[in-house]
C-alpha cells in the first residue's frame, strides 16, 4: 500500500511481464464492468499530478451538488497524467442521468482549465470534443497548434476540417 498526500489508497506495480499482461487485460475490461453499475458518463482527461488531488476534491464536491450520490469510478495511467474519469448514475436516481451531462462537463472543463489539464488525454479531440476544445484553449494555444499541424501537414490532408476550420 502506497499513500502520497492521501491521494492513493492502494497501488500495485507489476512484478513480471505476465502480471503486467494480466493488469492490462483487467484494465481493458474495467469500463465495461463499470457500466454494469449504472449509466456511465466517461471523460478521458489529463491533469498534472500536482493538481490531481485538488481537482478530485473540487470536482467531486461540485458534481455531487448536481447529482447527489453520483459514483466516481476513476482509473488511469497516472505516470503520464491520464485519467479515465468515469461517473456512474447513483442508485435510485430520479430523472434522466444523461440530461446532467452538460452541467457536469462544464464543471470538469472549467477545473481542467484552472488546473492546466486537458479535456482529452490519450484518445484525441475528434469531432465529439471539438466544441469543448475551443472553449478550453486560448486563442494563442490554438494558433500554436495550427502552426504545428501546418508544419507536419502543409497540404492539410490529415483530418481536414475535423478540428481546425
Predicted feature descriptions by range:
Residues 1-100, 104-107, 111, 115:
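C-terminal substrate-recognition/cap domain of FAD-linked oxidoreductases
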Residues 12-25, 120-135:
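Short proline/glycine- and acidic-rich turn/helix-capping motifs at secondary-structure junctions
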Residues 99, 103-107, 120, 128, ...:
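Short amphipathic alpha-helical segments
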Residues 107-118, 134-135, 150:
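Short basic/hydrophobic patches in alpha-helices and adjacent helix-turn junctions
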Residues 113-125, 154-158:
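Alpha-helix capping/hinge segments and adjacent helical runs
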Residues 130-165:
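Activity-critical C-terminal alpha-helical subdomain
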Amino acid at each position: 500500500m502506497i499513500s502520497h498526500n492521501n491521494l492513493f489508497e492502494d497501488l500495485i506495480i507489476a512484478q513480471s511481464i505476465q502480471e503486467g499482461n494480466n493488469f492490462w487485460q483487467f484494465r481493458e475490461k474495467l469500463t465495461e464492468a463499470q457500466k454494469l453499475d449504472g449509466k456511465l458518463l466517461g471523460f478521458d482527461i489529463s491533469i498534472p499530478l500536482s493538481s490531481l488531488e485538488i481537482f478530485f476534491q473540487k470536482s467531486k464536491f461540485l458534481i455531487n451538488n448536481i447529482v447527489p450520490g453520483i459514483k466516481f469510478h476513476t482509473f488511469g495511467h497516472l505516470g503520464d497524467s491520464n485519467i479515465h474519469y468515469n461517473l456512474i448514475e447513483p442508485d435510485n436516481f430520479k430523472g434522466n442521468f444523461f440530461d446532467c451531462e452538460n452541467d457536469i462537463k462544464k464543471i470538469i472543463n472549467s477545473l481542467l482549465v484552472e488546473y492546466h489539464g486537458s479535456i482529452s488525454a490519450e484518445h484525441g479531440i475528434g469531432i465529439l470534443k471539438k466544441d469543448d476544445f475551443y472553449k478550453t484553449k486560448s486563442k494563442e494555444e490554438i494558433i500554436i497548434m495550427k502552426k504545428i499541424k501546418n508544419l507536419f501537414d502543409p497540404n492539410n490532408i490529415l483530418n481536414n476540417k475535423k478540428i481546425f476550420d
